[in-house]
């Protein structure tokens, strides 16, 4: 099972917000998911990002691949740097 960390679209038409979820890569974008890692609201000024850092690192170490957008969000929050440092120290 290929696991990805990606965005699940929520909210009304023309006013989206997203949940950052861990899901099987074969499941639909807004379909079945394994676990919620955080939220992302691009409409707030500045954009609002809330991520459970421990959960995100756990899934990254398990082998889940983040989507491009999630990778950028994780980088801005410093999670990718912590993941790479933990990987290098082993």
From Swiss-Prot:
Keywords on record: Ribonucleoprotein, Ribosomal protein
Pfam families: Ribosomal_S16
Cellular component annotations (GO), alphabetically ordered: cytoplasm; small ribosomal subunit
TM stretches of this protein: none
GO terms for biological process, alphabetical: translation
UniProt superkingdom: Bacteria
GO molecular function, a single term: structural constituent of ribosome
Keyword check for Ribosomal protein: yes
Family affiliation: Belongs to the bacterial ribosomal protein bS16 family.
PANTHER family per UniProt: 30S RIBOSOMAL PROTEIN S16 (PTHR12919), SMALL RIBOSOMAL SUBUNIT PROTEIN BS16M (PTHR12919:SF20)
Official protein name in the record: Small ribosomal subunit protein bS16
Organism of this sequence: Bacillus licheniformis (strain ATCC 14580 / DSM 13 / JCM 2505 / CCUG 7422 / NBRC 12200 / NCIMB 9375 / NCTC 10341 / NRRL NRS-1264 / Gibson 46)
């Amino acid at each position: 099972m290929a696991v990805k960390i990606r965005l699940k679209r929520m909210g009304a038409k023309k006013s989206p917000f997203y949940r950052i979820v861990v899901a099987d890569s074969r499941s639909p974008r807004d379909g079945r998911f394994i676990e919620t890692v955080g939220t992302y609201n691009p409409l707030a000024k500045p954009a609002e990002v809330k991520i459970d850092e421990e959960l995100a690192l756990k899934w990254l170490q398990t082998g889940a691949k983040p989507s491009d957008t999630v990778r950028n969000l994780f980088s801005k929050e410093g999670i990718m740097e912590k993941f790479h440092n933990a990987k290098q120290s082993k």
